[in-house]
């Protein structure tokens, strides 16, 4: 499988998304009760619990292990903050499209799921300082060759997950209503479709794509 960054790489930064507060930078974030994958750090003396929503389909940031528990870089980072700050963490795995609505409704306190900081999101939620810089990259199906942005534009079908930064990148390349963009509900579905040749390529976060390629060579 071949991974290629296009010429005008879109840089995004992962951060925590927090419910917007008056007078601070704003943003929207969602999360609800865990359907699977709920877990928590050991309880501190204070007993304060921070409800953290994740879409555990973004290895190495967050994914589900064999026991359906959430694991990954974001989990380790949040647990380290909880230990230092003296609070407990309740992780909740939810579909991506439910994360920001749940945050806005107060069902969770934080969304931590490799969230890209955008101007639109800052209008409805607050963000932490960025803790990881991510590029959007093109994952190319077997037998396809992509050397530059013009090669990407020449592809017949390019996958992206609805609402992800890769979707926004695809819209910049092809147009928001272009039939070239094949949208998927989840990242695993898109990655599998690229692998099977159902689409010519897919656009997603560099760290996630690199992890997928490493484990599927």
Show which residues each predicted segment covers.
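Ligand-binding cleft/hinge of the Venus flytrap
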Residues: 62-64, 78-87, 166-185, 213-217
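Alpha-to-beta junction loops
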Residues: 87-88, 105-113, 157, 195-208
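Bacterial lipoprotein signal-peptidase II cleavage site
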Residues: 21-31
């Amino acid at each position: 499988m071949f991974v290629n960054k296009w010429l005008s790489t879109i840089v995004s930064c992962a951060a925590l998304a927090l419910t917007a507060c008056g007078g601070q930078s704003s943003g929207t974030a969602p999360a609800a009760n865990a359907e699977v994958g709920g877990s928590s750090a050991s309880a501190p003396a204070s007993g304060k619990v921070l409800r953290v929503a994740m879409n555990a389909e973004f290895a190495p940031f967050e994914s589900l292990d064999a026991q359906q528990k959430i694991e990954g870089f974001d989990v380790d980072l949040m647990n380290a903050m909880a230990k230092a700050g003296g609070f407990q963490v309740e992780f909740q795995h939810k579909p991506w499209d439910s994360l920001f609505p749940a945050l806005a409704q107060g069902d969770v306190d934080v969304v931590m799921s490799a969230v890209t900081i955008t101007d639109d999101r800052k209008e409805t939620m607050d963000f932490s300082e960025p803790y990881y810089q991510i590029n959007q990259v093109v994952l190319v199906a077997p037998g396809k060759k992509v050397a530059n942005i013009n090669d990407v534009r020449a592809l017949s079908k390019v996958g992206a997950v609805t609402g992800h930064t890769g979707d926004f990148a695809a819209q910049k390349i092809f147009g928001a209503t272009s039939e070239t963009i094949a949208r998927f509900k989840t990242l695993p579905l898109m990655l599998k479709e690229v692998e099977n040749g159902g689409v010519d390529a897919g656009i997603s976060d560099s760290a996630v794509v690199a992890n997928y390629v490493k484990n599927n060579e």
